[in-house]
Structures are given as structure tokens and as C-alpha cells.
From Swiss-Prot:
<dbReference type="GO" id="GO:0016853">
    <property type="term" value="F:isomerase activity"/>
</dbReference>
<keyword id="KW-1133">Transmembrane helix</keyword>
<protein>
    <recommendedName>
        <fullName>Linalool isomerase</fullName>
        <ecNumber>5.4.4.8</ecNumber>
    </recommendedName>
</protein>
<keyword id="KW-1003">Cell membrane</keyword>
<dbReference type="GO" id="GO:0005886">
    <property type="term" value="C:plasma membrane"/>
</dbReference>
<dbReference type="InterPro" id="IPR041411">
    <property type="entry name" value="Ldi"/>
</dbReference>
<keyword id="KW-0997">Cell inner membrane</keyword>
<feature type="transmembrane region" description="Helical">
    <location>
        <begin position="118"/>
        <end position="140"/>
    </location>
</feature>
<comment type="pathway">
    <text>Terpene metabolism; monoterpene degradation.</text>
</comment>
<feature type="transmembrane region" description="Helical">
    <location>
        <begin position="67"/>
        <end position="89"/>
    </location>
</feature>
<feature type="topological domain" description="Cytoplasmic">
    <location>
        <begin position="141"/>
        <end position="644"/>
    </location>
</feature>
<dbReference type="Pfam" id="PF18566">
    <property type="entry name" value="Ldi"/>
</dbReference>
<keyword id="KW-0472">Membrane</keyword>
<feature type="transmembrane region" description="Helical">
    <location>
        <begin position="30"/>
        <end position="52"/>
    </location>
</feature>
<feature type="transmembrane region" description="Helical">
    <location>
        <begin position="91"/>
        <end position="113"/>
    </location>
</feature>
<comment type="function">
    <text>Involved in linalool degradation. Catalyzes the reversible isomerization of linalool to geraniol. Does not show stereospecificity towards linalool isomers and acts equally well on both (R) and (S)-linalool. Cannot use the monoterpenoids citronellol and nerol as substrates.</text>
</comment>
<keyword id="KW-0812">Transmembrane</keyword>
Amino acid sequence: MESTRMLRQPIQLLQGHKGPVTASRHRRNAVVYALLCLLALLPVATGQSAAWQAAGLGLFMPGAGFLALGGAWALLFPLTVFVFWLAVIAWFWSGMVVAPLTLWLGTAALAGWLAGEAIWPPAVYLAPAAAAATFLFFQYRGAKRRAKDREHFKFRQSFFAESLAEVHQRAATEPEPGERELTPDQLQGVRYLLELALQPVGQYKGYTIIDQFQPAALRYQLNHIGFALGMVQGHYTPNFQGYLGQAQRNVIDTYRERKVWGYWVYESMWGHFNFSDFDPARKDNIMLTGWYGMHVGQYMLNAGDTRYSQPGSLSFRLNDKTCYHHDIHSINQSVRENFQSSDFCLYPCEPNWVYPVCNMYGMSSLAVYDTLFERRDTAQVLPKWLHMLDTEFTDQKGSLVGLRSYWTGLEMPFYTGEAGFAFFANIFSTDLARKLWAVGRKELSMCLTQDAEGQTRLTLPKEALAFFDTIDAGNYRPGKLFAYVAVQMCAREFGDDELAEAARRSMDQDCGPVVENGVARYTKGSTLANIWGVEGRLMRTGDFRNSFVKGPPSSVFDGPLLGDARYPEILVAKAFSRGDDLELVLYPGAGDGPQTLGFERLKPGVRYVVEGAASGEFTADADGRASLAVTLSGRTALHIKPGH
């Protein structure tokens, strides 16, 4: 899944500069704004009416036209600037392109409408001066930040090679298939996911519901439930379907509810000015196609279920008359074609805004699709994608740019960071992933402290964090859980178990852990942060990557299947086949006692013997099915194999 370019070259920490596409966007901005300034001065230069002069001055910057009114009216200028900033936030928050455009042009028109017989003379100078001062202010801030970034890059260079060598060493050893089982602690976390996922399709008890545009959106909670359950399926219980399979299909189907994807109707209208075609898997919207393709592909790979390759199996219904028909093929076709047609290769989530992290999900979707259908889409796209990431989306300290405008090339601060997302990159480029983690782990090691018991924990000082890193992305409230769980997941993926344990200790000490009716969660965190926390509990070295590009060994798809087990009475900690047998580890979820297991994919008419916590035998029927009564008491291990 690596590009040949990355395989031939050593991994280097690169310092970003303004790339050619970004530079061309900036030049275009300058030309357009220069023309706008000429247009702004034209009414004054040609002696037009005060109304036209005031409206013209309003083109220099939002609200500048109010300066032409003089007196108290001029106070509307700073107020407009503040509201314009909110409009820009609405633009990147929900792709609402109309918000800043309407405010800028609308206030210019309003100033013209309010103008009297003559404008206030100093406004002719104050309006362009205010625009120039604003430009110089942001240039100064940018230059100061870039100088600081260059110093930070030098610091990173001092430790990068040594840290990268340690990453290679720690990530080299991965768990063997079939040699592990879910612990009681992990099962408590998995039950948190199952309680959410086993609800009927379209019900959302326990989910965080705030908006459907940014990280707290339902789609991201559903995706990460899918990622976590996919790892359970692939690494712990590949030979169990039952309620685990139902839970995974439920979240896939709930994702197609209009409540989840309907945000695209609004973004299409106020972002693309498209009022007729709201297909969520056509143009842009990698926050759906990339994430969903990755999610569905992972389920198909680990469960061996091909239903979502059928035409129309992943359709999105707008109303009684309109339905957008899709399947795993068309979802990934959309991702591939958008990558190929974008000037940046990386392409937008919301109209106009390109998030490199979201684009990692898109590359991951292609990677799992390649594994499923023996294609080479990733190899075709990845070399250019990585080049553009280095040249257009890397800052001068070597970090990824959080957010860049596709139309203007301007960047905005947003969630990013080596320590939070390297495990996603590991799916499609181990080189990129290890480069990111080599930086993240070393900088995090400076945040390790000793708690009152002398144990190592993670302490993240506020002064060292960006604003977004102090906010729980799943509910937009101040909180530490999301930062801790992101570190835990990355550390587990790359074999940094000491750092992962330090993050887990911090979670347990700071975030209010509770276990209620066998379900574990953290009270001081969003649903999304809790879901990430379960992923971190489950993961071991390479687990995230392998659940997308490797999957279970072929033997599990040939052997017997535990097809029926009641939830929550029976908790399945292991279900693994080496070809014709079935290894099970079960726990009682509602008290010790007798339970019935249902088996599928047995050899018809063959006698099977049961060893372990129970003994006996049974014979498969003509359809390869059978049932078995067992008594669960604590950890209950069974080994089922053909009799001789």
C-alpha cells in the first residue's frame, strides 16, 4: 500500500513552504483584490453620488462603507468586522459560502443606502488605511508564527532520527492471529459500543446530538463505532457473527438515515449554489465518502460479508421521490475521481475547505477497497497525494496544516497534530505514519510525570496546547478525554505501550470512569471521545492498519461460525478457527447460568466434540447448523472440533 517513491527514499522530516498551487491561489487573490480596490475608488474618482461613494468604500473591507457616514455610524465598522469573523467561522463550520459574501456586499450596499448628500471626507483615506492595517497585522502575525515554527523545526530535527529508529523497533512486532481474547475490562468497553449500536436503525439514545456539520456530528460517532467493532471482529472474534454482526450493520444502515447525511442538502445550496442535486457521494464531501467507504470496507473485510458490493446497497434516500443509489464501488469511485480532479489532489469536506486529516480517511477507504477487490487505486493516487501533502499542506515546523481554503489558499487553525492522527496514516503509508509518530511521541514524552503513587501519567500543560486541543471534539466543551484517548490510540498502534498506559492512567484519574451494569464509560467526555477510548482499549501494535489492509487469516472463513448468542447474557471474548475447529472464550453478561449457543458453517452430518469448560458432542444437521447448551461461569473456554 506504499507508494514506490516513499519506499525508495529514507523517511525525512520536511519543512513546509508555500506550494505552487497555494501560491497561485494567493496571486489570484491579490489580482482580484486589486481590481476590487480600483472599483472601490472609482465612484470617488469620477465624482459619483455619495451613495455610490459610500458603497464603493465598503468594498475595501467589510463595513468600511460605514466610515463614509461619519459620526456614530462609523461604530458600525468594527461591529461589522466582528460579525464578518463570525460569518467566516460559519463558512468553514458548515461550508456556508454565502455568509461572508452576503455580509461584505450587503453592508456595502447598506452604507450606500444610508448615505446622505456627501460622505465624510476622511473616509476616503481611512477605508483603504484600515484595509492595509488589517493586512499588515495578519502578515506580521504570520511572519512571527513562521519564525517560531522554524525554530521548532530545528528542535525536531535534533531528535527525529533517534525517535524514528525507536518507532521502527517498537512497531516491528505485532500480535499473532488467534492468540488473544478480550479481557473483562475490554468487554466492558465493547458493551458501551453495543448498547449504542444494537438500537433499532434510526434511534440515537446515548449519542451526542449538537450539529451535523463538524466533529460532534452523528456520522463520526457511527464511523468510530464501526472502526472499533471492526477491530473486535477481525482481531478477537472473527468467527462470531450474531449480535456483533448485527451491531455493525446497524451503524452502517443508520448512517444512511437523512438525519445523519442531510447536512449535505444545506451545504450543497449555501456552499455550491446547487439547489437540485444533493447526492452526498458525488462532489467533495470526503467527510462522508472517505469515512464511510473506510468504515464499510473494514466491515466487509473482517466479516467476509459482500452484501454492500451489490448495486443500491448503500443508497441515501432524500424523500419519497428521490434516492441516491450507491454501493461500496460507487463510494470509492467518488473518492478516487475527486482526488484525481482536485488541483491539490486532496479535496474538500465542506465546500471549499480541505482538511488533510479527512483526506487520510479517503486514502484509507481506497486502501481497504484495494484489499477487498485486488485493485491498485491507492498506488495510482498516493504518490501525488503525498507530494501535495508535503508541498501544500505542511507548515514550517513540519506539521500538517489543519485546514486550507480550496478557492483562496488561505489556511485556518483546526484539529491536527502528529500525536492524534498518525494511526490513520498507518493504513495507507507506514512511512508517513511513522514520521508523524516519531515527532509526536518524543514531544509527548516531555509531558510524562509521576502521580501520587509514583506511577507514570500524562500531563498536558495548557500553555503547550493549541486551543482546539483543550476542547473535546465530540461536544465542543473544555475537556481532556479526547486528547488522552487520541494519544492512547496512536501509542498502541505503534507499540509505545508505556505511553499508552500513561494516557490510560490519566483518563482514569481525570475523566470520571464509571461502570454501570457492566458498561464502562467516562463521565467527563463526549460519546465520540468515549468511543475512541474503547478503540484504545482494544488496540495492540498494528491493529488499526491490519483491520483495513490485512484482515483475519483465511482459515477463519473456512471454519465453524458462532452464529447465535444472546446479548447481554453471553459476552464473546474470543471466536477463532484454524480451519475446521472453533476456539471460544465466553463470559456471562447477566449472571452465571445455562445458555444456548448456535453454530453455523459446520460440515453437514459431521460429529463435533466439545472440550474445555464443558464436554460433550453434537452432530451438524444437513445445513451445517447445530446448537449447544453450556453453563457460563466466569471465563468459560471451549474448543470445538470434528470428532475422529
